Amino acid sequence: MTIIRRSFLILLLICLGCVAQSAPPDVARKIERQVRSYYNMPPDVKVTVGSIVPSTEWPGYDMVAVNIDGGEGKSKDYQFLLSKDRNTMLRLTKFDLTKDPYTELMSKIDLTGRPTRGAKSAKVVVVNFDDFECPYCSRMHQTLFPELLKEYGDRVEFVYKDYPLAEIHPWAIHAAVDANCLAAQNPDAYWDFADYIHANKREVDGEATPGARLQALDKITMLQGQKHNEDAAKLQACVKAQDETAVRASMRQGDDIGVNATPTLFINGQKIDGLVSIQELRATLDSALKDAGQPVPTRTASSSLPASK
């Protein structure tokens, strides 16, 4: 029994040495200040220092998790290395060379049921996180369609995901819901709606009141549905319900992969932030085609010139 008790006590002491420990208040305060300063965080962002656990990969260091919460569900944990003397903290990025980063990122984007343009069999997929009220999105949309769609043809598939910036664009979520109501019956109706809104955003903005702007969106939606012979009663019911579930799920997915502005494109996983030139888009598309073993379009000298504004 004595041997058993001793063995149990030894095992207990070993385990106690490995369990997580709360960061002492003074250490937690230092860590929080360093994180706030380095990432230039405003006071309303909540920084929480988690437990300290021994590192199994880095001798001489412990691991500490820091949670950064910007509100509205935008919360993420970051792992740091903390020296045993608590005087040094490191932020390392670990790369898994057995996985392709672009393929891994694309696998995190759910494209199920989304309307597409181009060929579904294309080896290059362009995912655009779009906001119908965003003026830069409108300019990007008019670069992608029809110019790049015509130029790349069946070499590329284009897919749109919802990422309305509701804090600054009050009718963007409503427009996204309306567009998805159209898509539920006919993907072509979705694209005609997207083409129209991005080309005629002022028509909605020109209405005098917020309610009138939403009514204008619904009117455009019903007209597009009529054009494509959609079931008017079903479309009207969908528009009236304004179910934001799918839109907000798309927004959360964007948050998870680093989207924080619009437009944001992923070309076979390569991220492009904001409005960029058509030359940069062509270069990225061509690179993705070459990586996929596909031919790039043959261009004339005139097609290489900057697009007119």
What spans do the regions from the language model cover?
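Residue-level signal for mature regions of secreted extracellular proteins and peptides
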Residues: L11-L13, V127, D231
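Cysteine-centric redox/oxidoreductase cores and disulfide-bonded domains
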Residues: Q21-A28, E32-Q34, A65, L165-T262, ...
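Bacterial N-terminal signal peptides
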Residues: S7-G17
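A broad, structure-centric signal for solvent-exposed, well-ordered loop/edge residues
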Residues: F8, T56-P59, M89, V124, ...
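Extracytoplasmic thiol/disulfide redox context detector
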Residues: C18-W171, E244-G258, L285, K290-K309
